[in-house]
Amino acid sequence: MIDRLVDAGAPVHTCCRLLGVSRQGYYRYRKRPTSATELRRRWLTGLIREIHIASRGTYGYRRIHAELTIGMNIPCSNRLVSVLMTRAGIGGLPGPVRIKRLKGVATADDLVNRKFHRLALNELWVTDITEHPTREGKVYCAAVLDACSRKIIGWAIDSKQDSTLVVNALDMAIRARQPAPGGVVHADHGVQFTSWVFTQKIRSAGLLPSFGTVGDGLDNAMMESFWSSMQIELLNRKKWKTRVELTNAIFEYIEVFYNRRRRHSSLEYATPHDYDLARTARTLTTTGSKRPRVGVSYTHLTLPTTPYV
């Protein structure tokens, strides 16, 4: 405490008097050699700063702890990471505000019923559209997410939201995955998703269309969660000048950061890409209802070449 006050410019004698400490005792304390525990904490604080920078300033203490213990094999506790971050003035971005939504009216079959958990790839894909303004006008992004690995497997960006936008995102996912028949593609009741061309694209790939309740975002909560993360970690962090600038940033966020570097709490802090690879290679072990661990080496978070902001 006194050290921090003195470093901030406060007189030593004033700090000692206010805190009831003798100046002689304080100076004896200052002359003591730094303990091994304190040296380790300083070292960990430096690593925490590097990880926080590499995450574009988005990681809180849980993901930083995962990066230290899983990515770097450094044993430490969640609490220690939280304490060191607080002392160093490092913090993650605040989470989304949870809003209770009113129940809407169902107008089409919902094959998911808010049960998004899947243990195999390509059993369930969820898709949706988000928008964000630039000085040139809005940018619309459609994405397709695999419910098992949380990986974005298809996406498309345009200056208008129409059926072509969502079909392009779905087409990218189908070409990348070549799914077996019987998988489900789940969306909301936007006109782009209920259009003939989109539902026909689903059926022609041997997949089944599914639509949540009208007006209830919880029926597509997994996709809403991804959009919320992207809003907090990318879109809302600056004012975007051009559509090209924002398009490039979304591309980097999805393909470089989210899929390959960002650790996901529901995947036991694996990245979607690593979890996807492990599922494909069938190197997972399942224990009861607990989500299985990834049996491949984790990708270590590296410093970004281009910051988002």
Predicted regions and their residues:
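Mobile-element integrase/transposase regions
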Residues: 74, 82, 86-143, 164-169, ...
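RNase H-like two-metal-ion nuclease catalytic core shared by retroviral integrases
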Residues: 101-103, 187-189, 193-198, 209-231, ...
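Short, amphipathic alpha-helical "recognition" segments used to contact nucleic acids or chromatin
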Residues: 1-9, 49-52
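Mobile genetic element proteins and their domesticated derivatives, centered on retroelements
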Residues: 16, 26, 48, 64, ...
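Single conserved hydrophobic/aromatic residue that forms the stacking wall/gate
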Residues: 300, 306-309
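Basic, flexible linker segments flanking DNA-binding modules
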Residues: 16, 23-121, 216, 271-281
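A short acidic/small-residue loop/turn micro-motif
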Residues: 146-147, 157-162
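C-terminal domain-tail junction helix/linker
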Residues: 46, 203-205, 229-301
